[in-house]
A protein has these predicted regions:
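Short N-terminal binding/cap micro-motifs at the start of the first secondary-structure element
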Residues: 11-16, 136
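The conserved acidic donor/metal-binding loop of glycosyltransferases
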Residues: 109-112
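A structural signal for short hydrophobic beta-strand segments in well-ordered beta-sheet cores
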Residues: 25, 141-143, 213
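Catalytic-core segments of class I nucleotidyltransferases/pyrophosphorylases
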Residues: 148-218
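Conserved N-terminal catalytic core of the sugar/cofactor nucleotidyltransferase
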Residues: 2-5, 13, 19, 26-27, ...
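Conserved donor-nucleotide/metal-binding helix-loop-beta segment in metal-dependent transferases, i.e.
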Residues: 114-137
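Short, well-ordered beta-strand micro-motif
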Residues: 27, 142, 170-172
Length: 218
């Protein structure tokens, strides 16, 4: 199993802390957010974590050294990849394209969670979601009668679903995701000037991949 952690965003919602410390390195309970995130994934995931790929901005050598140490502390190889322009979530994941091979978890670094993180051999894809009261500020998923995810809607203005994506995804075949991300880039499929991960997810479902929702307690 490999883990990709996109974390190049500015973290403006956590200012003033993020004026001096990148958002994922802001400490929560004595540990940086990103350390807690990947440690929780490693603890809950039954399959060993081989590699953790951090997608960063211009954070500097000391931050990169700290991130590699986080990976090493979990028994995984660490790697650094760069997203130097804010071109969206799909672009961020694609910045670590060489890691998209075999089973992959994508976990955006501003997410802290308590979740059911069980992955079975039959699972093609899992998106962890949380039921919320006001979904208009989030990306949400629609389910069919079998409980499978069939659509992704970003910040719905009319009610579509109350299941918000929390920013953690599992793909059994990372190469399949890489193909769809490359399609977005090649055809310049953008929204608001950014390449969005849900557009790649939608293409995967249209191609027959089955996503199921993972549950989050908090």
């Amino acid at each position: 199993m490999k883990v990709i952690v996109p974390m190049a965003g500015r973290g403006s919602r956590l200012r003033p802390h993020t004026l001096t410390i990148p958002k994922p390195l802001v400490p929560v309970g004595g540990k940086p957010i990103v350390h807690r995130l990947v440690a929780d994934i490693a603890r809950l995931c039954e399959e060993p974590i081989e590699q953790i790929a951090f997608v960063v901005g211009e954070f500097g050598a000391e931050v990169e050294k700290e991130l590699l140490a986080v990976a090493e502390s979990l028994g995984a190889k660490g790697s650094i990849h760069y997203q130097l322009e804010a071109l969206g979530t799909a672009h961020a994941v694609m910045c670590a394209s060489e890691v998209l091979d075999g089973p992959v978890v994508v976990a955006f670094a501003d997410t802290l969670f308590k979740a059911d993180f069980k992955i079975s051999a039959e699972d093609q894809g899992i998106l962890w979601v949380k039921q919320i009261e006001d979904p208009s500020a989030f990306g949400v998923v629609k389910l069919n009668e079998q409980g499978q995810i069939i659509d992704f809607v970003e910040k719905p203005q009319t009610f579509v679903s109350d299941l918000a994506m929390i920013g953690i995804y599992y793909f059994k075949d990372g190469a399949r995701l890489r193909k769809e991300l490359q399609y977005l880039l090649d055809h310049e499929i953008v929204k608001g000037g950014e390449y969005q991960l849900p557009d790649a997810l939608r293409r995967l479902t249209e191609d027959g991949l089955t996503f199921k929702p993972g549950t989050v307690e908090e």
